[in-house]
A protein has these predicted regions:
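Conserved anion-binding
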Residues: 112-168
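Active-site-proximal beta-alpha loop/turn segments in soluble metabolic enzymes
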Residues: 55, 102, 134-147, 171-185, ...
Length: 292
């Protein structure tokens, strides 16, 4: 908890539950990532915390935005940023939402299936598209290795089709899992992705972007490596696998940008036992989903 948050809670004594964010911490996290990986484009993952004040602060700092829904795009629009700073990064979208986003000026879209690619070809002609591939998520607290992404061979086939169908086959994305504790997972993923780049180039599909996704952990109670260590590991992996053929780089930090910036203050509503001889106590807070 920062001194500013502590002072606010002490002086204002807000009704609970109350979430307080120190925007200076968010800004410092952004600036540090940009300093450590200056060539990377930072797309803040809006789903991590879409509070208007956070989006506005990041917009003023030059951040771009990774969005997963029409609602998130509309939140970003409220900051006044141009839509060329927005990625529609969800690989599962309604066709009408793709069409709407395209009309608003969004030109960067994710996909991981032929059906999704067909939607993009129909209602977002000429858009830049990137395919999400499946990678190893070992070491992550929340693996994302099944629901999103496709096998590398399928991804190569889809990117060839993207070019044939009038889309801009822009690049490849991956996600090593949320709260990833193994720094080497980005190296393993980039080894796989770089080979896809080179194979597609030989087939006449010149990709230009690699999206590192998120996964950079926030520090809660358990200790994790510093963001410096993560960014240095990613930088080494990029050089190792792409050398002088370096593509554009996108990263999508979410909780690592905001997770350590706030505190939720709650109240203990009830402490009880379920039987006279029960030694376990149940502690109920006013922040529970079902009011307890």
């Amino acid at each position: 908890m920062t001194e500013r948050i502590f002072r606010y809670l002490r002086e204002q004594q807000p009704e609970t539950p109350c979430l307080v964010i120190d925007l200076d911490v968010v800004e410092n996290n952004f600036r540090r990532m940009r300093e450590l990986l200056p060539a990377a484009h930072i797309f803040y993952a809006v789903k991590a915390n879409p509070a208007a004040q956070i989006l506005a602060r990041l917009a003023n700092l030059g951040s771009k935005f990774d969005t997963a829904s029409r609602g998130e795009i509309e939140m970003v629009q409220q900051t006044g940023v141009s839509m060329d700073r927005v990625s529609f990064g969800n690989t599962i979208k309604k066709e009408k939402d793709i069409a709407w986003a395209y009309q608003q000026g969004v030109r960067l879209f994710a996909f991981d299936s032929e059906a999704e690619l067909q939607k993009l070809a129909r209602v977002a002609p000429g858009a830049r598209v990137f395919c999400r591939v499946l990678v190893d998520c070992g070491g992550a607290e929340w693996p994302l290795s099944k629901k999103f992404g496709c096998a590398p061979e399928m991804a190569k086939d889809l990117l060839r089709k993207a070019k044939d169908w009038g889309l801009d086959a822009y690049g490849i994305s991956f996600h090593v899992g949320s709260q990833q504790t193994d720094l080497e997972q980005w190296d393993r993923a980039l080894a796989q992705v770089s080979q896809m780049f080179f194979a597609l180039a030989e087939a006449g599909v010149d990709l230009r972007m690699v999206n590192l996704g998120g996964g950079f952990p926030a520090r809660y109670r358990a200790e994790v490596s510093s963001i410096d260590a993560y960014c240095e590991a990613v930088g080494r992996a990029l050089v190792r696998h792409f050398g002088n053929r370096m593509p554009e780089v996108i990263m999508e930090p979410g909780r690592s940008m905001v997770g350590d910036a706030g505190v939720i203050q709650s109240e203990v509503v009830l402490v009880s036992r379920k039987a006279a001889n029960d030694r376990k106590r149940w502690v109920y807070l006013d922040i529970g989903k079902f009011s307890g």
